[in-house]
């Protein structure tokens, strides 16, 4: 029992000196749906093209064997190949969980470590915590809305650290920014 209490106490001390945030990547329901629809649609177009070329129905619906191959069957085959290539790309992004990673603020080492999963390699960035001037909230509404948390860094451009994708609710964005600003003991800008 005493070892458990010591462990929890050391975890609390560690959590007071280290703030770690997990960032979600491309493993979202919407990406699974898009990849599935592209796969099914691509196979459907390819089967329609093959039906047109061979004169046999490979699809249970419709009668694609009656299509003339040169204009329609060929174009349907090209659509099928394009959809299939896009589906492969989406499945690859989902497989590697593109964009996922960790924001780790470590007061012991005095370093902010950002890591993200890239398409071909992982991206690692380390910045000294004392170079962070402020935490900035960016909110832009309209056709292409933007809601993100960025860090104002001395001598550099702002560094976005929030997840990419659908805009976060404003309350969640404010809470995330306030938590980081409180931990780093810097100002929160953009409210």
From Swiss-Prot:
Keywords: Membrane, Photosynthesis, Thylakoid, Transmembrane, Transmembrane helix. The chain crosses the membrane at residues 34-54, 68-88. One of its GO terms (cellular component) is plasma membrane-derived thylakoid membrane. It comes from the Bacteria. It is found in: Cellular thylakoid membrane. One of its GO terms (biological process) is photosynthesis. It is a multi-pass membrane protein. Pfam families: Ycf4 (PF02392). Seems to be required for the assembly of the photosystem I complex. Belongs to the Ycf4 family. This is Photosystem I assembly protein Ycf4. It comes from Prochlorococcus marinus (strain NATL2A). The lineage of its organism: Bacteria, Bacillati, Cyanobacteriota, Cyanophyceae, Synechococcales. The gene is ycf4.
């Amino acid at each position: 029992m005493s070892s458990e209490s010591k462990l929890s106490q050391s975890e609390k001390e560690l959590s007071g000196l280290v703030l770690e945030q997990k960032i979600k990547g491309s493993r979202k329901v919407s990406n699974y749906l898009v990849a599935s629809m592209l796969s099914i649609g691509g196979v459907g177009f390819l089967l329609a093209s093959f039906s047109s070329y061979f004169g046999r129905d490979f699809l249970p619906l419709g009668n694609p064997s009656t299509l003339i191959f040169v204009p329609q069957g060929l174009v349907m085959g090209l659509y099928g190949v394009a959809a299939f290539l896009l589906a492969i790309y989406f499945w690859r992004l989902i497989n590697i969980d593109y964009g996922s990673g960790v924001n780790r603020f470590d007061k012991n080492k005095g370093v902010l470590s950002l890591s993200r999963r890239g398409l071909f390699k992982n991206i690692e960035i380390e910045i000294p915590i004392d170079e962070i001037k402020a935490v900035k909230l960016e909110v832009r509404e309209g056709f292409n809305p933007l809601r993100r948390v960025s860090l104002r860094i001395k001598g550099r451009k702002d560094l976005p650290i929030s997840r990419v994708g659908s805009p976060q609710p404003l309350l969640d964005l404010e809470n995330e920014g306030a938590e980081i600003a409180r931990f780093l003991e810097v100002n929160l800008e953009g409210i």
